[in-house]
Amino acid sequence: MCPLWLLAALLALSQALPFEQKAFWDFTLDDGLPMLNDEEASGAETTSGIPDLDSLPPTYSAMCPFGCHCHLRVVQCSDLGLKAVPKEISPDTTLLDLQNNDISELRKDDFKGLQHLYALVLVNNKISKIHEKAFSPLRKLQKLYISKNHLVEIPPNLPSSLVELRIHDNRIRKVPKGVFSGLRNMNCIEMGGNPLENSGFEPGAFDGLKLNYLRISEAKLTGIPKDLPETLNELHLDHNKIQAIELEDLLRYSKLYRLGLGHNQIRMIENGSLSFLPTLRELHLDNNKLSRVPAGLPDLKLLQVVYLHTNNITKVGVNDFCPVGFGVKRAYYNGISLFNNPVPYWEVQPATFRCVTDRLAIQFGNYKK
């Protein structure tokens, strides 16, 4: 457990670069998931970082739940075997950490009076029931981490101020239309590790959202879901059962710059599919069943990283990665992985990688027979 003085000190340093875990927020996640900068929030008026503590009322230092650690406006009640949300939480609390307990239900008045709460951590409890008004008092809540619980549905009536929702590793099978209604500031949703199938997403389930980041990994998807927010910059669908990428699958995601499709069963990527991703910088297709390098990579002028290791690729053509000729303007690759494929790497022509910054950026080897 982090010392409380360290938690408080790191609170001020939590404005990390986009999609990188930094300092304070590391303690809330144990699965290496990337963290979003508050400046990525789609509603500029919502925040530019951690709330201004000086603008809040004086701290109620005498109020601290039994067994918890309270300092500044951080209340840490993790790893205490709690069965319910504790009482006597200071009304000026901005971060409440309740992870690693035995809480099974969130009741109507559990968070009453916590109108300044910015982040709520409920990871790794036994929550299966949430009152429809449980989050009503949390008018300034921006980060809700409720992963690794027993939820079978996305909680109703989430605060309209919410920017980031981590709800992975639950038992959710359905995302109904309207469940995210009114969440115009939502920027990041992590919902992997749920038994979601393609049929579990109702048409219009993501209507109104302007997400930057979405992860639905380790689910039961057999294809790229339709009608995801077209504002996405990052989409991670790794560890699913996707078998093919068809022409129309990526049509609406022209703003993507990172696409994760590793650890699926992809055998075919239809020609022209990748042409809808003009801003793509990073493509993960490792651990699939591809027999050739996908067509269209040379036309992605911003693409810099391609993971193709652990597939069934038998041949790499001289124009598979780079445009024909040397005068075509494009970003240089700084990472291409092709190891663990049945391609004789000694037969690949050196000119194949003429648009790579450094030969060390090319990962061959581990020849797979």
Curated annotation (Swiss-Prot):
PROSITE patterns this protein is in? LRR (PS51450)
Q: Which UniProt keywords apply?
A: Disulfide bond, Extracellular matrix, Glycoprotein, Leucine-rich repeat, Proteoglycan, Repeat, Secreted, Signal
Predominant cellular place of this UniProt entry's protein: secreted
- InterPro entries, per this entry? Leu-rich_rpt (IPR001611), Leu-rich_rpt_typical-subtyp (IPR003591), LRR_dom_sf (IPR032675), LRRNT (IPR000372), SLRP (IPR050333), SLRP_I_decor/aspor/byglycan (IPR016352)
Glycosylated residues? Answer: S42, S48, N271, N312
Q: Which domain of life is it from?
A: Eukaryota
Where are the annotated LRR repeats, by residue?
A: 83-103, 104-127, 128-151, 152-172, 173-196, 197-221, 222-242, 243-266, 267-290, 291-313, 314-343, 344-369
Pfam family, any one: LRRNT
Signal peptide positions on this chain? 1-16
User: In this UniProt entry, which cysteines form S-S bonds?
Assistant: C64-C70, C68-C77, C322-C355
The cellular location(s) given in this protein's UniProt record come to: Secreted, Extracellular space, Extracellular matrix
Mod. after translation: The two attached glycosaminoglycan chains can be either chondroitin sulfate or dermatan sulfate.
The record's section on SUPFAM superfamilies has: L domain-like (SSF52058)
- Please list the residues that make up the propeptide: 17-37
**Tissue occurrence:** Found in several connective tissues, especially in articular cartilages.
Quaternary structure and partners = Homodimer. Forms a ternary complex with MFAP2 and ELN.
Q: Which family does it belong to?
A: Belongs to the small leucine-rich proteoglycan (SLRP) family. SLRP class I subfamily.
PANTHER family (alphabetical): AGAP008170-PA, BIGLYCAN
The protein's name is: Biglycan
Top-level taxonomy: Eukaryota, Metazoa, Chordata, Craniata, Vertebrata
